[in-house]
């Protein structure tokens, strides 16, 4: 893995983003922000899942008012997601949010952007410049207030970076230039509490846009694949796109966008980071895929253990194996392991047999050892 790109560090609430801070995991509420009770409940659920930053949609003034109450009832850093109307950003700052997300594709009046920047600067609140393929300004119209139609703006006719002829303007150029336009406004006002995202559904477009931006600005990058899909397809797409960038040392905070429970976004985000050894938060599960040699339902066992491990915060490696071929070896390499079969299970701790139990007792015995290991690591 390549050395991480060191960006300018900023603080989103009490979470440091960029610099040498760990890559943080964030999500977005899927409730109607105007429903305070439902939104607060979802935020608290996200916190329990390990989420470090939460973004809320702010479509109107009623949502802004609700945001103020949500802020009073929660402690996690909150980001106000703003589109179309700069006044919503100004009022969200009054509500006490920790960061703004502005879309340079649909707030393109320079004067209005400047108003928001001045207020954010006075409060030392960061701004994420969030460029999305689905809301890019018209080709030739970056920074112009006219032309909002996605059907006649020329964006869909732009070639991908890999398909463009030498010197030909590509969709990646358009994404990056849109971001740089708004970055320029912020920099002219001596505002540098900047975070940037450049999202598309297409992995090649997204990865190339982030690579280019990483080369020309010092600011932290928020990674994401937009509208990535359901829990299964979206997790795979996000793991590939985000994983490529993170492996190259690019990225300071991530959001896995899924058409699913927001907590799944958090779990998936941490799994991506743990797989690259960028975070050591929570248990890591090693499980065999099962085959004809297994005489225990490994799939059911592994999924049950995986669900139970979600509450474990220590970086424990847990192995679930179903036969004698790789089971003992893999289990011995884990902090806690189980090799099951023939109506019994061997529980391992740090490579040593801890006990042999009946199959009916293996789950409870395994989790007893996991909790003991968790307590030992937490104490250290």
Language-model segments: what does each one mean?
Residues 1-27, 121, 307:
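N-terminal amphipathic alpha-helix/helix-capping segment at the start of soluble metabolic enzymes
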Residues 20-38, 57, 76-84, 140-141, ...:
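Active-site mouth loops of central-metabolism enzymes
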Residues 25, 81, 129, 196, ...:
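Conserved, mostly hydrophobic/aromatic
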Residues 28-36, 47-69, 101-109, 194-203:
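Glycine-rich, proline-tolerant flexible connector loops at the mouths of alpha/beta enzymes
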Residues 42, 46, 55-95:
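N-terminal active-site wall of soluble small-molecule enzyme domains
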Residues 61-82, 115-127, 213-221, 305-307:
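Alpha-helix-loop-beta-strand connector modules within alpha/beta enzyme cores
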Residues 87-128:
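Hydrophobic or amphipathic alpha-helical targeting/insertion segments
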Residues 117, 128-131, 143-147, 151-313:
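Catalytic alpha/beta core domains of metabolic enzymes, predominantly
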């Amino acid at each position: 893995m390549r050395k991480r790109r060191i960006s300018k560090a900023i603080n989103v609430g009490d979470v440091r983003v960029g610099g040498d801070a760990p890559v943080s995991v964030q999500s977005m509420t899927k409730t109607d922000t105007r429903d305070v009770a439902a939104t607060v409940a979802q935020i608290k659920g996200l916190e329990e899942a390990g989420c470090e930053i939460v973004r809320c949609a702010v479509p109107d003034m009623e949502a802004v008012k609700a945001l103020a109450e949500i802020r009073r009832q929660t402690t996690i850093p909150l980001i106000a997601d703003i589109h179309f109307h700069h006044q919503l950003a100004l009022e969200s700052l009054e509500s006490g949010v920790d960061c703004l997300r502005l879309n340079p594709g649909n707030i393109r009046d320079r004067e209005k952007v400047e108003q928001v920047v001045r207020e954010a600067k006075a409060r030392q609140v960061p701004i994420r410049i969030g460029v999305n393929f689905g809301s890019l300004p018209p080709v030739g119209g970056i920074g112009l207030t006219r032309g909002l139609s996605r059907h006649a703006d020329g964006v869909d006719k732009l070639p991908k970076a890999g398909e463009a002829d030498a010197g030909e303007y590509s969709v990646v150029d358009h994404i990056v230039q849109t971001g740089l336009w708004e970055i320029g406004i912020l920099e002219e006002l001596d505002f540098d509490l900047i975070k940037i995202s450049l999202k598309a559904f297409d992995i090649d477009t997204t990865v190339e846009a982030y690579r280019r931006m990483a080369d020309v600005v010092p600011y932290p990058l928020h990674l994401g694949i937009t509208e990535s899909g359901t829990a299964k397809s979206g997790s795979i797409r996000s793991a590939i796109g985000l994983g490529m960038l993170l492996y190259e040392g690019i990225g300071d905070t991530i959001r896995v966008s899924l058409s699913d429970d927001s907590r799944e976004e958090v779990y998936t985000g941490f799994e991506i980071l743990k797989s690259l050894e960028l975070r050591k938060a929570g248990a890591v599960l090693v499980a065999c895929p099962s085959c004809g040699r297994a005489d225990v339902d490994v799939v059911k066992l592994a999924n049950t253990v995986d669900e139970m491990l979600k509450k474990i915060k220590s970086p424990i490696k847990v192995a679930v194996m179903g036969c004698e071929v790789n089971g003992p070896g893999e289990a011995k390499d884990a902090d806690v392991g189980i090799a099951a079969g023939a109506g019994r299970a061997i529980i391992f701790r740090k490579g040593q047999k801890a006990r042999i139990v009946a199959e009916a007792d293996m789950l409870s015995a395994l989790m007893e050892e996991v909790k003991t290991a968790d307590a030992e690591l937490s104490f250290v």
